[in-house]
From Swiss-Prot:
Protein name as catalogued: Small ribosomal subunit protein uS14
Gene name tied to this protein: rpsZ
NCBIfam families in UniProt: PRK08061.1
Family matches, as InterPro entries: Ribosomal_uS14, Ribosomal_uS14_bact, Ribosomal_uS14_CS, Ribosomal_uS14_sf
GO CC annotations, alphabetized: small ribosomal subunit
Amino acid sequence: MAKKSMVAKSKRPAKFSTQAYTRCEKCGRPHSVYRKFKLCRVCFRELAYKGQIPGVTKASW
């Protein structure tokens, strides 16, 4: 889990566009965040396996 202060800081608008960065909405993780879902890869995988993300299915070929 991310520190509460860092999560609060990321929610504030950045002064400059280059300072903006994405964080996971669920856990606050700053790395490997999918912009479309606003989730990190760990949380995305958990929710996808539970079937809580509509339209996401496990790949099979």
